[in-house]
Amino acid sequence: MSFSVVVLAAGQGTRMSSSKPKALQTLAGKPMLSHVLSEVEKTKPDQTIVVHSPGHRDLVKNVATNSSEIKLVAQEKPLGTGDAVKAAIPTLDKGNNILVLLGDVPMIRAKTLKLLKEGVENVDILVLTTKLENPYGYGRIKRDEQNNVMAIVEETECNDEEKEINEINSGIIAFSREHIEELLSGLGASNKK
């Protein structure tokens, strides 16, 4: 099955007190986005799209030039992760499954991305999660009785019970093409991220 990768790099990095977007902060001498794109390239996607904020196109383009052909898409307004993915939809090749990841996860490895790529051929959505001792600041994973992921609840939207959940969203999700547009159509302005 063909697949596309969407790398979200429109985050402003305000918590880092920097004018540079979060994905362009440096780690081991290279922007985090560069580390991510290097690993993405190893998975041999049919297409790679980087979503950026309008004011940072040139900065993102400079980082992306070292990778294979990459399409750049601007998220016109900072309306969160779901909206950033929505911005990429018109550019995506039809029929491709989609792997979405954040541009600020420099420790991700191609092996993990390949497992998600292969796994989404058998299911509609795969969410890469992890458990943290202190999950403050992260979206929590809500599961049903059969252990299926039912929702990702952002920290700012968590009630007291949900704040006790220590399984969090890594920001890396694989979708079958048939379901991503349907899911994004249900995204409303009330979603903070």
Residue ranges of model-derived segments:
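Structural beta-sheet core signal
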Residues: V5-V7, I49-V50, L99-V100, I125-L128
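Catalytic-core segments of class I nucleotidyltransferases/pyrophosphorylases
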Residues: V149-K193
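Conserved N-terminal catalytic core of the sugar/cofactor nucleotidyltransferase
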Residues: P31-E118
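Conserved donor-nucleotide/metal-binding helix-loop-beta segment in metal-dependent transferases, i.e.
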Residues: K111-Y136
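Short aromatic/basic micro-patch
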Residues: T26, M107, A174
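Short acidic-glycine loop/turn motifs at beta-strand connectors
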Residues: K142-N148
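N-terminal nucleotide-binding beta1-loop-alpha1 segment
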Residues: M1-S18
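Short catalytic helix/loop segments, enriched in acidic residues and glycine
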Residues: S19-L37
